A protein has these predicted regions:
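A non-catalytic alpha/beta surface segment that caps or lines the substrate-entry region
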Residues: 45-99, 123-126
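N-terminal hydrophobic or amphipathic helices/low-complexity stretches enriched
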Residues: 21-49, 63-68, 114-117, 221-224
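Bacterial N-terminal signal peptides that target proteins for export
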Residues: 1-8
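Cleavable N-terminal signal peptides
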Residues: 9-10, 20
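Active-site metal-coordination/substrate-binding segment of hydrolases
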Residues: 97-169
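Histidine/acidic-residue-rich, glycine-tolerant segments that coordinate divalent metal ions
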Residues: 162-246
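An extended, acidic, His-containing surface patch that forms the Zn2+-binding/catalytic region
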Residues: 80, 97-99, 204-206, 263-328, ...
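N-terminal signal peptide c-region/cleavage motif recognized by signal peptidases
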Residues: 16-17
Length: 471
């Protein structure tokens, strides 16, 4: 799941900057496009059994590009009777490593797409009107392509890093994250990196005209937690209604949750985000960002930020009803009514404390709570100076020297949360960028601009050469 600077853009909006469109593509660019097309056209959604197909293709490309069998590890996971695989690839240091390894993340799976609801077939890479269309073009097949193509490019050029670079591609980030958990555990036990860099978050934020506004570094993620709230009742015949009713009782609980506002929260990272984003955002919203950054108790600023879907998540915990099911027949009183509540919890609050708050808000012991998610909590990451300097170098190479680099917190979760939970600074620093509401990740007609695709390919190349000992 892609997450980019949430103060200006919602999740999954950023994909590489539209710099000059090259008439002639380099061999590297053409190779990257071929990789992109191949992985996008593999339907690697849950239930399709195709993640191993993606793995097989990438492994063949890497071996053809000079990576040895010993550099590649494929791991198998059986998830709900489906074989899912993860992939780890080592670009090993020349001789004795001079520094701790760097781990690089992306995910090979996608949210499924129903072909009959799309304007174009979602599992064919279609280039049209300056865009690449297809499921995963933004989330996260571009991240996969960028890392794989960069490894191949560096290997072809004979680059010899002074530290190990370890590319870790998960196979079920969009669902249970079983492969993610196992890979994070392995990383902690065997690799012990200096830090982790994620290609599924971060990137350039562009205005409506395509002008870069800032580069976002994802340094934190809110904790994901989903609860089921259930009311049970003896039920009966609808012609003899009871005074109590499971649906009405659940509805009362939901209305209380709707009315409740979690406390306003902030951190140095979110205040810095609001300050930087506010300077780039025109009108009342930008003014509210700046006011909140200056004084997080400013009630007018809080009201403005919480009224905007793009900024409310950065002001505290949110819990929202997302699903309902109740009853078993149209002429029977409901014996059970269940609602699903999805929470995005501000770092440091915790899942248990959030559940307790919801119970107090509902104030009805007849409403039972069940936590149905099992994701971990993760702290904010530090921002290593060498990573920030490498990003600045990559931006300068793209003609964006001096562009503000903004740390931010994502309202959703990526593979990175498991690495943060284990104590590793994990930064989303993809080379992508897009205008607001322009990629439709997880939605219909997902796309990424062609200029964006090619404009961001050098990003990881420059960053990794800088961090791993450019020659």
């Amino acid at each position: 799941m892609r997450f980019i600077p949430g103060l200006l853009l919602s999740a999954a909006l950023l994909t590489a900057a539209p710099l000059a469109f090259a008439e002639e593509r380099t061999a590297f660019e053409l190779q990257a496009r071929e990789i992109y097309q191949t992985v996008v056209e593999i339907r690697s959604a849950k239930g399709q059994g195709n993640v191993p197909v993606v793995v097989d293709y990438i492994v063949r490309e890497l071996k053809a590009g000079g990576f040895a069998d010993a550099d590649i590890e494929v791991t198998d996971y059986e998830i709900e009777d489906e074989l899912v695989q993860g992939l780890m690839v080592w670009y090993r240091a020349e001789g004795t490593p001079k520094q701790k390894p760097i781990v690089l993340l992306a995910h090979m799976d996608v949210v499924d797409a129903l072909p009959d609801t799309w304007t174009r077939y979602p599992f064919e890479l279609i280039e049209e009107n300056g865009y690449f269309f297809g499921r995963g073009t933004a989330d996260n097949k571009y991240g996969v392509t960028s890392l794989v193509a960069t490894f191949l490019r560096l290997k072809a050029e004979g680059f010899k890093p002074d530290r190990d670079l370890v590319m870790i591609l998960s196979g079920d980030e969009e669902t249970g994250m079983i492969s993610t958990r196992a890979q994070a555990k392995y990383t902690d036990e065997k690799i012990k990196p200096a830090y982790v860099l994620n290609a599924d978050a971060g990137g350039l934020s562009l205005d409506e005209n395509g002008k870069p506004l800032l580069y976002g570094v994802q340094g934190a993620e809110k904790t994901y937690a989903t609860f089921e709230l259930t009311v049970s009742n003896p039920g009966g015949h609808s012609s003899t209604p009871r005074v109590d009713n499971a649906i009405y009782e659940l509805a009362d609980a939901l209305k209380k949750i709707e009315a409740y506002k979690f406390p306003v929260m902030h951190s140095p990272l979110t205040l810095a985000s609001f300050k930087s984003a506010g300077a780039q955002t025109p009108g009342p919203l930008g003014e509210a960002m700046l006011a909140f950054a200056k004084n997080p108790a400013d009630e007018a600023a809080i009201a403005a930020l919480r009224a905007n879907p793009e900024t409310v998540g950065s002001t505290g915990t949110t819990c929202i009803a997302t699903m309902l099911r109740a009853g078993h027949a149209e002429n029977a009183l409901p014996q059970r009514a269940t609602a699903t509540i999805n929470c995005r919890i501000f770092p440091g609050v915790g899942i248990a404390a959030t559940e307790q708050t919801l119970k107090e808000v509902v104030g009805n012991d007849g409403v039972t709570f069940k936590l149905i998610s099992d994701l971990v909590e993760s702290p904010e990451s530090n921002l290593p100076d060498e990573v920030m300097a490498a990003i600045a170098k990559a931006l300068a190479a793209r003609g964006l020297e001096g562009l503000p680099i903004l740390p931010h917190m994502s309202s959703g979760g990526t593979d990175g949360l498991f690495y943060r939970n284990l104590g590793y600074d994990t930064l989303g620093i993809d080379g992508s960028g897009a205008k607001p509401n322009d990629t439709f990740a997880h939605g219909l007609n997902e796309r990424l601009s062609v200029d964006s695709f090619f404009g961001g390919l050098d990003h990881w190349y420059i960053v990794l050469k800088d961090l791993a000992g450019a020659e």
